Design a protein with these regions (language model features):
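Active-site loop/oxyanion-hole signature of alpha/beta-hydrolase fold enzymes
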Residues: 14-16, 49, 55, 66-115, ...
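A short loop-to-beta-strand scaffold at the N-terminal edge of the catalytic core in hydrolase folds
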Residues: 15-25
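Conserved HGGG/HGGXW glycine-rich cap/lid loop of the alpha/beta-hydrolase fold
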Residues: 26-80
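Conserved hydrolase catalytic core segment
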Residues: 109-152
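Conserved alpha/beta-hydrolase catalytic His-Asp/Glu region
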Residues: 169-223
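Conserved serine/cysteine hydrolase catalytic core
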Residues: 205-265
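Catalytic histidine neighborhood in serine/cysteine hydrolases
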Residues: 269-283
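Catalytic histidine-centered segment of alpha/beta-hydrolase-like enzymes
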Residues: 281-291
Length: 303
């Protein structure tokens, strides 16, 4: 399958239900599932290049895969929440649990691997630390430039731009603006940048272009401070130490969010993640360049 299929399901929340979209690649009845969860302001099409490479490599090995890339609620093809206070990791975790249960009902899941970029990795750590709540425990966990302890400077930078920007007169103007905001993504060709970021925008009724996500996702950062970040880090650290899944940590060598010190600490506790640092990249590696994709394929497809 060279293009994904868009599906939707309904997830419960404290105000009722909301609809979540997800992009599915590969064979819908494959028992090996890879769940790819995006970063804070991103959406499931971020993983297009990785999905194609992973499916091609699996086919060479004679293996069947089902890749699922959700649009976390408030983003992309998913609903916006009526209560913005629900834009937080526990809501997202519950939605992923619902999604996995639905996928398992469609076709039994024998193995579950998780690829999580930034926020998607936080959700992944929460899920992997509570395997009893999943239809299948996370077997392999790939954390893309994220960990239990995050730099306040990096979070403050994200806080400064999330929910800001636009509308734009054209799609190209929006994509160009993102190239400045997201310089940490590292070097990309113009074509790569367009493919990666065109799904970040939608055209409004008046013809201008706006971000695909609900600006209210920024409210989760309103009360965030250096002190609350430290408190949250302690909670996440305790959860990280409960994880038993085979874990690979990718870190952009220039990352503001995940310090080298914190990344090294992750190799010495909990699942004892294997660390790979990627030169010339900050937060976060986009998994588009071949040197970023290759370690992911090696990790997910090894026997």
């Amino acid at each position: 399958m060279t293009e994904p299929q868009l599906h939707h399901l309904h997830c419960k929340d404290s105000t009722g239900t909301h609809r979540m979209g997800y992009w599915q690649w590969g064979q819908s009845d494959a028992q090996a599932v890879v769940l790819c969860v995006h970063g804070l302001t991103r959406q499931g099409r971020d993983f297009d290049v990785l999905a194609r490479a992973l499916l091609q490599a699996a086919q060479v090995q004679g293996r069947s895969l089902r890749l699922v890339c959700p649009d976390v609620v408030g983003r992309g093809s998913s609903d916006w929440l009526t209560d913005p206070a629900l834009y937080q990791p526990l809501t997202y975790l519950a939605d992923m649990q619902t999604l996995l249960a639905d996928l398992h009902a469609q076709a039994p899941i024998a193995t579950l691997d998780w690829v999580g970029t930034s926020m998607g990795g936080i959700i992944g750590m929460l899920a992997a630390a509570q395997p009893q709540a999943l239809v299948q425990p996370v077997r392999r966990l790939l954390l893309n430039d994220v960990g239990p302890q995050l730099s306040w400077a990096g979070l403050a930078r994200i806080k400064s731009y999330v929910g800001q920007g636009g509308p734009f007169d054209s799609l190209q103007a929006g994509i160009a603006a993102l190239r400045q905001t997201l310089a940490g993504f590292g070097p990309h060709t113009d074509e790569q940048w367009h493919v990666l970021n065109a799904p970040m925008f939608k055209q409004g009724a008046e013809g201008s272009w706006v971000f695909h996500y609900d600006p209210a996702i920024a409210l989760a950062f309103a009360g965030l401070s250096e002190a609350t970040n430290q408190q949250g880090g302690q909670i996440m650290q305790a959860l990280y130490e409960q994880i038993t899944a085979d874990t690979l940590l990718l870190r952009g060598a220039d990352s503001e969010l995940l310090s080298r010190e914190n990344a090294l600490a992750m190799t010495a506790c909990g699942p004892r993640a294997r660390l790979i640092e990627l030169a010339g990249v900050g937060h976060a590696p986009t998994l588009v360049a071949s040197e970023q994709i290759e370690p992911v394929l090696d990790f997910l497809l090894r026997p």
